[in-house]
Amino acid sequence: VEDCGIALGQAFAQALGDKRGIRRYGAGFDPRNPFTGESYVPMDECLARCVIDFSGRSYLVWRGLNPLGMKKILPAEKKQDASSAFRFGLAREFFQGFANEARCNLHLELLYGDEPHHIVEALFKAFAKAADFACQHDPRIAGRIPS
């Protein structure tokens, strides 16, 4: 799983090149409705948030799972059968690999949630929305490298 994050991060770094003309910062909000703010994604009982900056500096902030939260998640993970289980810890390794190779500042936060599958899905969807926004070309900075 970490290798997938590394490969995807390398692909992003190569595709973005010098980042000329992109927004660079991604909070996943819709420009037609700027009041939506950051990339919040609900998934049943979970709520996840992601903010990303393709700054050239690698850093992952992974928050929201305190020891009490992990005590709820680990038993639920153990109930999954091996064919459908995706260990929650692997998600963090994916995002660490991505942040390192894409050279981005990536903030992922679980605001609340209990079910491991829902948590992982909400985090990945929030990440996708924020990355999509950050990689879009902004006509106001066309041809320039964002600062």
Task: Enumerate the predicted regions with their spans.
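Structural preference for solvent-exposed beta-strand-turn elements
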Residues: 1-147
